[in-house]
């Protein structure tokens, strides 16, 4: 399953969001011969060591080794974890997601992507669009892309949900060219 992106729910994650992510990520990456597969969920209790009681958040980097083991076991190109818990990293109040290109893994949180988090009415379509943008962003990092200055590019850094809402779920022309060069040259495929 080398040319496969594995999607792993961590804790309870809505199945419609997972399906939306899987279908749209695959529709884009299929041109590189990369498919997407959703596997069974990991219990959030497996990451109790990442929980900060005072912040009521999970330290994102502690999820990555488990995702890396899944990548190895499935011989996958990449693994994308999806969770509903709130994530943070040292020096940051929160993060929407994290990626580790060396491990070939990424993680996104839906927690702050729900419109309800901001006091807005529920909007499933908006939630799914935001989740797709964050997933494509983190996968871009997995495949070697850096942040992009173009605010419409999915690789633009999201400092707030406003930034996420402004950008597209697609890579800009420059980032797409870099991605095509990397995936076309076996940038990721040659890794173990």
Curated annotation (Swiss-Prot):
GO terms for biological process: proteolysis. Zn(2+) 2 binds at residues 148, 153, 172, 175. SUPFAM superfamilies: Metalloproteases ('zincins'), catalytic domain (SSF55486). Keywords: Hydrolase, Metal-binding, Metalloprotease, Protease, Zinc. The active site is at residue 138. InterPro entries: MetalloPept_cat_dom_sf (IPR024079), Pept_M54_archaemetzincn (IPR012962), Pept_M54_archaemetzncn_arc/bac (IPR012091). GO terms for molecular function: metallopeptidase activity; zinc ion binding. Its cofactor is Zn(2+). Its EC number is 3.4.-.-. Zn(2+) 1 binds at residues 137, 141, 147. Binds 2 Zn(2+) ions per subunit. One is catalytic, whereas the other seems to have a structural role. Gene3D superfamilies: Collagenase (Catalytic Domain). Belongs to the peptidase M54 family. Monomer. HAMAP family: Archaemetzincin. NCBIfam families: archmetzin. Probable zinc metalloprotease whose natural substrate is unknown. This is Archaemetzincin.
